[in-house]
Each structure stands twice: as C-alpha cells, then as structure tokens.
Amino acid sequence: MKKAEKRIARDETEYFDYDFVVIGAGLSGMCAAIAAARRGVKTALIGDRPVLGGNASSEVGIDIDGAAYNSRWSVSVYARETGLIEEIKNRLYHFNRHDPEKGAAHDAALFDAVLAEKNIDLYLNTYADEVTCEGDRISSVGCVQLASERRLCFRAPLFADCTGDGSVGAKAGAKFRMGTEGYDEYKENLAPARPSSVTNGDTIMFHTVRMDTPQPYERPAFAYDVTKLSFFKGLGTNNRIFSKYTDGLYQGFWWVEFGGHLDTIRDNDEITWELRKIVYGLWDYIKNSGKFPEAANMKLTKVRPLAGKRESRRFIGDYVLNQNDVENKTPFADAAYIAGWPMDVHADYGVYDSRPATYWNFVPGMYNVPFRTLYSVNVENLFFAGRNTSCTRIANGSTRVMATCAAGGQAVGTGAYLCRKYGCTPRAVYREHIPELQKLLLRDDQTLMGYKEDYALENAVCTATSCKRTENADREELMPLDKSYVLALPVKERVDSLCIALKNEGDAAVLRWRVLEGDLPECYLPERIVREAETEIPAGADGWISLFPNVRPGKDGKVYLQFLPADGLSLYVSKESVTGIPTFICEEQEPSLRDRRRFAFTLSYKNICFSELQPACALFGAENVLSGYNRPYGMPNLWISDGKWGQELKISFSEKYVEEVHLVFNTELENDLISSQSAKVIRDYDLVLKGEREEVIPVRGNYGRVNRFAVGRKLTGVAVRPSENYGGKNFEIYGVKIY
C-alpha cells in the first residue's frame, strides 16, 4: 500500500514558472540560456542527456567547428566566432588540456559554464514529450525526467527549441522543412532540379590512446568485415581518408556517415547501429590488415555511444537564409551573428555513396545571419537556435556547425531579454528593437560583421610605452620558393616600396612577383591582378632586397604581394605571425561551380619577412583599442607593443561615469579549434582605474579573450600594465571597452 501511495505521489506533475525556457542543452541552448541569464532573465535549461554540449559532449565527441574552418582555409582568416562560444572554447581548453578524449574534464568545464549562472536552473535527463499551446503561443512544455520518474511542466512566456531535431517546435505546430529544396524555390544553383527528402547523415566518432606495447584487437561478432562492403574499394579516395589528429592517433572519421537517405529522426536507431558496425569493423581493418603499422600500439578506448547528427528538421522563420545570401553576403539590417563554414553538403548515401563524401562549396568568408531566422513564422513566442534554424538545406551546410550555432544561441538569449524587458514577441524585437539587440550583442563580444561599437568617450587620448613597427623582420628560417606564396599587407594609403628577405642558392635568377587587390574588408581574398613585375637576384644573394609596388590598396584596405615559384630561391620567414598580416600558399585555378575564387589560398604557419614599408604605416598604435571592431576588419585593429619590458597602455578622457571596463585580448581567431594556449594572450597584468582615487586591480593567470570589471564610479582614465603572456614576443590588446 505504501508503495502504491509513493507511486501516485511520483506521478503527480510538478509545475515550474520561468521567464524563459530553453529545451536542448547543446552549445546553442547553453549560450541562449547563459546570454539570457546574465541579463537577469530567470531561465530553465532542459536537456535529455546526462551531460551538456550536445554534439560537443563526451557522448558524441565532435569538434566545435565554425567560421574559421580548418584553421587554414577560411578567406576571412581571423574568423572564429567570439562572444560566449569563445569563452566556452577557451574554458574547455584550459580545463581540458590533458583530456583529449573529451571525457570527464570536458564535461566538467561545460557544467561549470552553466552552473556559474545564478539565473539558470538546469534539468538534465529530462525529455520534453508534450507541448500545450493557447492560440499561436506555447503555454507550457511537459517533460519526463528519466530515472527519477518525475513529471515536470514548465510554463513561460518565451521558449527556445535548441534540440537540433526541433522536437518541441514540431509538437507546437511550428512550420518546418526536412530535406532538400529544389532549384526553382530559391534559385540556388547548388540545389537539385527537384526537391527531395535527402539530408546530411550521421557519424559516430571514437577515441584511441597509444600504449607502450602492441595492443591486440578482435572484431566483435556484430561488426562488419569492411573488406566485404561496397564502399571498401573506394577508401582513400573521394575525401575518405584515414586521417590522424594532431596527436598522431586515429580519433574517428567524419566521412563514416550514414542515414541521409533515411529519416534521421524516425530511423535514428537503425542509423546508429549501422554506424557502430562500420566503426568497429574499420578499427579491425586498421589494426589487423597489416597496412597500418603505426596503429600497432594504439588501443581503442571508446566508441561514442551517440551518433553526431548533422541535419533533420529546419524551422521556417520570418526569413529563410539561402545559398544566394551566403555567397552574396546579403546586407541584413537585423544581423545577429556571423557564419562562414563552407556550404558543406554531404553525399546522399554517406559512406556507401560512390561520389565524394562532401563538397566544401566555397563561401567568401564570414557573413551575417539575420535575427529573423531565429524565431518561428507561426508560433509567436518560439525562438530556435542550432542546426534547426530557418535556412535552406544548402545554406544549412554552412550554418549548422556548432560554433556558429552557439553564436545564434547567444543572439536568441539576448533577444529573449528584450522580449522580457518590453513584454513583446520575438517578431517585435525584429520590428522595433534591432539596434538595441545589436548594441547588446556587440557589448557581449558577439561579432557582427562590419559593425563597430561607439564607447562615447569625449576627448579620449590613447598612448602607449611603445608600438610595434609594421614589419616582420625576425628571419628565423628559409622557406623554398617551390610554391606560390602571398604576403597580405593592410595599409592605410599606399605601398611605394618595401624590403623582403631572400636567399639565392643557385645562379643568377629572376624573382617574378605580382600585386593583387581585393574588395572585402572582412576577408583576405585577392580578386584581381594589378601589376606584374620581375626583379633580378644575383647569384649567392642572401639578405634584404627592395621591391617597388607603387600601388594603393583595394577596397578591402590591403595590398597582396604574390611571389611565384623560382628554382634556387628561398624566402626568409618568421615562425611568429604578425596579427593582421598573414602569409598564404597560393594556387591559381579556373572558376568552377563550387569554387568561385580565381586563387585558392591556404594559410601558412610560416610568415614572410618584410621591412622598410614606405610610406611608413603605423598599424599597431594605441588608438586601435578604441576602434570598436575588436578583431581584424580591413585593418588589424589592435595595439601591439614593441617588446615586453615595462609596457603600459593608457587612455585618458573627460570625466565620465563608468559602469564597466572590458579588456579584449588576442586569442588568435585564425585558429578554428583551440588545441593549444595562445602565446599572445596576456596572462598577468594590472588594470589601473583613474579618477578621484586611483585603483590598481591585479590580474594573474588570465587565459581568455574578454576580461570584465565592474566599476560604478566616475573615471578620467584607465591604464593596462601587462607583465607576461604565454610566450609571445609582444603584448597585444584588441579593445579597451569603456561603458
């Protein structure tokens, strides 16, 4: 009898009221919840798994990719999403550097990010299985909490579906699409002639470690003998290669994909089992075929229990982003976040498809995504963020990666704050409050391409102990000119002359070089050849030579110098990059359907040495910390010191009441994944607040991009006195943001 009474009590529904309910605790949902909570919105974050992070969690183990894709191929170069996802990625590395498995430390870092917020209540193992609507609004979401057997009901004026599959919005009747649009609908030339149900498929990742002795492996009975599968003969081609991670280990293959021709929601279990059979079978082939001797001491420690899902439902918002917007960078007045991953559309049948595993359809650098893609066209209080936002399948190939999705989540959480502030709907935020939304997003370090902040400082004067010259003169090693290399130079007026360092180890030779120009300030994308020239290099030459481009920069504010291959010639390079002045490997190519660049570029980790730029161009002055951009956009937009000893950056201004001061450091936005601590981050410094009294705030052990300080009094100036970073030669600061 007592047991029956307990059972009845357990089945009673518990009711909870919040300002904002976020369903889905992946990175998108986390960022939506954190953004809202930090502005005082009482938020419930609901996830159906025992851990946070979604595809980035320990259960799935997918890397957090974004606009700076593959760290070397994005033409925007310094393209990594900032804001909350930058904070989370740096936190993950800092607490997870000795846990490449994405295991316990990884999960703990994500827990920390959410549990630090007093306005978030976290509900894990909680599945939303019921949605109640009143008219065109969701009034409540009913959930069952697994294991506890509790029945929970969440009521709120605002909801966000960040589930990936769009399960809550679908239950509410929100309009959505699933599959591929035909060409006629949006005139996307990458779309098929007719619509279909095809989506991108799923992938299961795994983890290995290297042991001191050989590790035997026996294929489980359920796994495939992959040598008997139809795709086996094609392995090693069509992007299906056995790639290793930077640690030299096999950690999973993105191209082990299945399910795009099925229903990735309804057929989830079938898809997952097929992938398991393939993964265990592939590891058997790697270990026991004799063709991978380097794997002898590798041990398979984990096959992720969940498949990483790329695509399923896509909701319909007030705007549907499409391929033409991505390629043409449609200038949306309601820009809410950036994207920049290629339009990555995978083969219909995944690993079983005879075509390439994917086409990385070119995107011309970062672009803005509108706020209207983040709320429902027909459910008036429903936001969404993640891979289920309002876009075509082709555009979704670019927006679906996790760092980009998380930036969308931050926009949603900030939009929810404005909805609560004004008692309005998401659509009303678009119609009436976009300038305020964008101002808040910029303040919180969200990147909106081409937008800059105004700190409203009167009579501001910036000075510094020193500023780096516009040069890269540390000749550390030689790089043979066996390929075509490009030096990208942001300049304010023109380049009449400069010096580069080279060595000729053969007979007298000719250095052939070009000057190119581009149009997009957010990119390093030369579009046209301005002039071509030749310079004679004597036999045995070893040192600096002068070049005379005599050109103005293009619309993007840059001059590109391309050095063509030459036998016997080598360029001197520096291992340390100068922010904003990258070096590229360049290959000329014909325009094609999938890649409209005339020149294909890969960012080089070795940087061409140059000096004596004329006319002199001071790119790294103290005044850059008030530029309002806080990342390269046309110009590098940061202060760089000349050396590290005794440096100080000072800003004085007319007396002003200051709420907060934000310092923005250089975490090297050119790297998509954070796999090492950026040497350029200022670790130790003192912040000096100047007014009626001077206050010195010591900071030690910083590793992040943005440091925030509450002030709450009148100031006449601030100063930053850096004392150490993580090994960089100079100190670098993007912004000193004074509010």
For each predicted feature, which ranges?
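Conserved N-terminal/central alpha/beta ligand/cofactor-binding core
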Residues: R7-Y15, A35, V41-K42, G47-R137, ...
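Noncatalytic modules at the cell exterior or secretory-pathway interfaces
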Residues: S497, N550-G568, V711-S723
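N-terminal Rossmann-fold NAD(P) dinucleotide-binding loop
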Residues: G29
